Amino acid sequence: MSDINATRLPAWLVDCPCVGDDVNRLLTRGESLC
């Protein structure tokens, strides 16, 4: 079950604009750190 939830989580974040923006911001920050 956890694997399925983990797979659906990104899609759910993409569906939610507000959360998606936060995630994109974190991903961008992570790429900057790398």
Curated annotation (Swiss-Prot):
Which tissues express it?
Expressed in basidiocarps.
Q: Which InterPro entries match?
A: Amanitin/phalloidin
Positions of the propeptide segment: 1-10, 18-34
Keywords assigned: Thioether bond, Toxin
Q: Where is this cross-link: 2'-cysteinyl-6'-hydroxytryptophan sulfoxide (Trp-Cys)?
A: 12-16
What the entry says about post-translational processing? Processed by the macrocyclase-peptidase enzyme POPB to yield a toxic cyclic heptapeptide. POPB first removes 10 residues from the N-terminus. Conformational trapping of the remaining peptide forces the enzyme to release this intermediate rather than proceed to macrocyclization. The enzyme rebinds the remaining peptide in a different conformation and catalyzes macrocyclization of the N-terminal 7 residues.
Q: Single GO molecular-function term?
A: toxin activity
Q: Cross-link Cyclopeptide (Ala-Pro) - where? A: 11-17
The family classification in the record reads: Belongs to the MSDIN fungal toxin family.
What does the protein in this record do?
Answer: Toxin that belongs to the bicyclic heptapeptides called phallotoxins. Although structurally related to amatoxins, phallotoxins have a different mode of action, which is the stabilization of F-actin. Phallotoxins are poisonous when administered parenterally, but not orally because of poor absorption.
Protein name according to UniProt: Phallacidin proprotein 2
Q: Which organism is it from?
A: Amanita exitialis
Q: Which gene encodes it?
A: PHA
